[in-house]
Amino acid sequence: MPNEFSAGAVVLRRLRGRWWLAAIRPGGKPKGTWALPKGNVARGDSPADTALREVEEETGLVGDLVRKLGDVKYFYVRKDGGRVFKVVSFFLVRYRRGRIGDIPAEHAHEVDEARWLPLEDAPRLLAYKGEREMAAKALEHEARAREAV
């Protein structure tokens, strides 16, 4: 059984007293299917580098890596019927610059829309269970960080 490795990010921005998360609507998915930016780890790249690259390609944003949040592991079935074991490493990334939705033309086919969502709503709005869990971890991390101040 083949293995597949990807990396993604929970990109956060603090604005007007609230935390916001960068989410995408992947190309060809129904409206309301919100996900986190992610992609396959290329040979020679680290998962962290992949996560930062995917953020820029799929949202138009540039961020700074804060920490690894965890891995999401699952099986899926390819169109040819083959099973694949997939591991997606997710990282917490702080927004540095860029305008959400300014997606480079060569990656526009991958994403129908990119938008800031309130972080506290992300566990409810994200379509995939593992990504909801990563958003919840990011929310917990930020709550602990604010308590420490």
Region locations from a protein language model:
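Active-site segment of metal-dependent pyrophosphate-handling enzymes
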Residues: 60-99
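Short aromatic/basic micro-patch
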Residues: 35, 85, 116
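N-terminal strand-loop-strand
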Residues: 1-36
